[in-house]
C-alpha cells in the first residue's frame, strides 16, 4: 500500500511511475479531490464541535442562573445534527479514499526498465545451453502416462480438470523435490515453515491478494473470511502482522512449504495440457524481512538462492528482469527465472523473485525498531519461489528423458529417490 501523504506530496512522480504499468490510473485525480474534501470536512466538524462545546458551557451557566435556555438549546440541537451529517459524509469520503488506496499498485524501482507493451522482456542471464537430443522428444504428459507416474484421467474423475494424481516414482519425485529444496535453503540459514493452508481475508489483504485478485482465489463458502492459500507469501508475511521486529534479527529469512490453490481466472484455454497450470500445486517459497537499505542486496541474494536449485539439478534456465508494465501488483522489482522445457521448445517461468519494499508491511503493519532513527520503521518484504515443484518436475522429465522413454534421475536427487532411473 502506498501512503496517502506520500502520494499527495509526490503526485507527479506517482502518476509518472504508475503510467508505466498496465492499467488506468485516472482515479488518482479523484483521490486528490477526495483528500481536499476530507480536510475541509475535518475543519468544519472541528469548528462545529468547538461551537457546540462553547454553547454547552453557556447552557450550564444559564441553568445555574435559572435563565431561559430554550433558544440556545435549539442552537445546540442544530449543531449536533449538523455534526452528525458531516461525520457521515466524512466516513463515506474516508471509505472512498481507502478503496482507491487499496487498489493502487506498487511503484516500480528506479532500476526497472520502463518499456512499452510492445517491447520484449530483458534477458538478464542464461545458465547452460538446452540439450540437443538425437531422438524425437516427448512432453511430460506423454512421458508421465507412458511411465504410469502421472494420472490425469483419475484426477479428473476425483475432482475435475487441471488436477493431477502423482503415482509411484512420480509421487516420490514430487516428494523428493520438496525435501531437497527445503534442505538446500535451510542449510543457507532460512527458517523452515509449514503454515496453515487456509488464510483469512486480513492476511490476503496484507500481501495484496485482496481486493485485486479476489476472483482468482478460492473462498470457503461456510466461512465469512477464509480462503484457500494461493501462495506461500500470504501466510509467511502474516506471521509478523502487527509486530515490531528486532533489528538484530534482520534480515529474517523463511523457507515455506505450502500447497497452493488458484482458480486461474482469465486463463481459459491456456496451458490446459499437463501440469503446467493447475488449480492445486505444491511450492517452496522464500521470504525475507529486511531493513530498507538492505532490501535490494537481499533481492540479489534471494535470486541466487532460487537459481542454486536449478544449478544443482543441472537444468538450463534464464533470468529475466521484468519491465514495469509486467510487474505484479505488490512488486517494485521482479526477476523471473524461466526453465527450459524441451517438450514445448520454450522457456517457462518457474520462479518470480520480488522486492515489495514497504508495500506489504504498510498493509500488514510490520515494523522494526531502528536504533539509528530512534523510532519504528516499516520493514521491506521480499518473496520468491524456490521453486514451484510441479514445474520443476516437468523440467526434469523433459530434460532428463532418454530414447527408450525412461528418465535419468538428477544426481542430487538420487539419495532422495533411492534410484537413478525412472522406468
Curated annotation (Swiss-Prot):
GO terms, biological process:
selenocysteine biosynthetic process; seryl-tRNA aminoacylation
Which Gene Ontology terms cover its molecular function? ATP binding; serine-tRNA ligase activity
The UniProt keywords, alphabetically, are:
Aminoacyl-tRNA synthetase, ATP-binding, Cytoplasm, Ligase, Nucleotide-binding, Protein biosynthesis
Gene Ontology cellular component terms for the protein in this record: cytoplasm
Q: What does this protein do?
A: Catalyzes the attachment of serine to tRNA(Ser). Is also able to aminoacylate tRNA(Sec) with serine, to form the misacylated tRNA L-seryl-tRNA(Sec), which will be further converted into selenocysteinyl-tRNA(Sec).
Q: In which pathway does it act?
A: Aminoacyl-tRNA biosynthesis; selenocysteinyl-tRNA(Sec) biosynthesis; L-seryl-tRNA(Sec) from L-serine and tRNA(Sec): step 1/1
Which sites bind ATP?
262-264, 349-352
Does Aminoacyl-tRNA synthetase count among this protein's keywords?
yes
- Enzyme Commission identifier(s): 6.1.1.11
Entry-linked PANTHER family = SERINE--TRNA LIGASE (PTHR43697:SF1), SERYL-TRNA SYNTHETASE (PTHR43697)
> What name has this protein been given in UniProt?
Serine--tRNA ligase
| Predominant location | cytoplasm
Q: Which Gene3D superfamilies match?
A: Bira Bifunctional Protein, Domain 2, Serine-tRNA synthetase, tRNA binding domain
Q: Where in the cell is it found?
A: Cytoplasm
- Which protein family is named in the record? Belongs to the class-II aminoacyl-tRNA synthetase family. Type-1 seryl-tRNA synthetase subfamily.
Transmembrane in keyword set: no
Chain sites annotated for binding L-serine? 231-233, 285, 385
Amino acid at each position: 500500500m502506498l501512503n496517502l501523504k506520500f502520494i499527495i506530496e509526490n503526485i507527479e512522480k506517482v502518476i509518472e511511475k504508475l503510467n508505466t504499468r498496465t492499467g488506468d490510473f485516472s482515479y488518482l485525480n479523484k483521490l486528490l479531490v477526495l483528500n481536499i474534501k476530507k480536510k475541509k470536512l475535518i475543519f468544519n466538524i472541528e469548528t462545529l464541535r468547538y461551537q457546540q462545546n462553547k454553547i454547552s458551557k453557556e447552557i450550564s451557566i444559564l441553568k445555574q442562573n435559572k435563565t431561559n435556555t430554550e433558544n440556545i438549546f435549539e442552537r445546540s440541537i442544530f449543531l449536533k445534527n449538523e455534526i452528525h451529517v458531516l461525520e457521515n459524509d466524512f466516513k463515506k469520503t474516508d471509505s472512498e479514499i481507502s478503496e482507491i488506496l487499496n487498489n493502487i499498485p506498487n511503484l516500480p524501482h528506479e532500476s526497472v526498465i520502463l518499456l512499452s507493451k510492445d517491447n520484449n522482456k530483458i534477458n538478464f542471464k542464461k545458465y547452460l545451453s538446452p540439450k540437443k537430443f538425437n531422438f524425437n522428444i516427448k512432453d511430460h504428459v506423454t512421458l508421465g502416462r507412458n511411465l504410469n507416474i502421472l494420472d490425469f484421467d483419475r484426477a479428473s474423475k476425483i475432482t475435475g480438470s487441471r488436477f493431477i494424481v502423482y503415482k509411484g516414482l512420480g509421487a516420490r519425485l514430487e516428494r523428493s523435490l520438496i525435501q531437497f529444496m527445503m534442505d538446500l535453503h535451510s542449510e543457507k540459514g532460512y527458517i523452515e515453515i509449514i503454515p496453515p493452508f487456509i488464510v483469512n481475508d486480513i492476511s490476503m489483504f496484507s500481501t495484496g491478494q485482496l481486493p485485486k485478485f479476489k476472483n482468482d482465489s478460492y473462498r470457503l463458502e461456510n466461512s465469512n473470511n477464509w480462503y484457500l492459500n494461493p501462495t506461500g507469501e500470504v501466510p509467511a508475511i502474516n506471521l509478523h502482522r502487527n509486530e515490531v521486529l528486532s533489528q538484530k534479527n534482520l534480515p529474517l529469512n523463511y523457507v515455506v512449504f505450502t500447497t497452493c490453490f488458484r482458480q486461474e481466472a482469465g486463463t481459459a484455454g491456456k496451458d490446459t495440457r499437463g501440469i503446467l497450470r493447475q488449480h492445486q500445486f505444491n511450492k517452496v517459497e522464500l521470504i525475507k524481512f529486511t531493513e530498507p537499505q538492505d532490501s535490494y542486496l537481499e533481492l540479489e541474494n534471494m535470486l541466487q538462492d532460487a537459481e542454486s536449485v536449478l544449478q544443482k539439478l543441472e537444468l538450463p534456465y534464464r533470468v529475466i528482469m521484468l519491465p514495469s508494465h509486467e510487474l505484479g501488483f505488490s512488486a517494485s522489482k521482479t526477476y523471473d527465472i524461466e526453465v527450459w522445457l524441451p517438450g514445448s521448445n520454450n522457456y517457462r517461468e518457474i520462479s518470480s523473485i520480488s522486492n515489495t519494499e514497504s508495500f506489504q508491511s504498510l498493509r500488514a503493519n510490520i515494523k522494526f525498531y531502528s536504533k539509528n532513527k530512534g523510532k519504528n520503521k516499516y520493514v521491506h518484504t521480499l518473496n520468491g519461489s524456490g521453486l514451484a515443484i510441479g514445474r520443476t518436475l516437468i523440467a526434469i522429465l523433459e530434460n532428463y528423458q532418454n530414447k527408450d522413454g525412461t528418465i535419468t534421475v538428477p544426481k542430487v536427487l538420487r539419495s532422495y529417490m533411492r534410484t537413478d532411473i525412472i522406468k
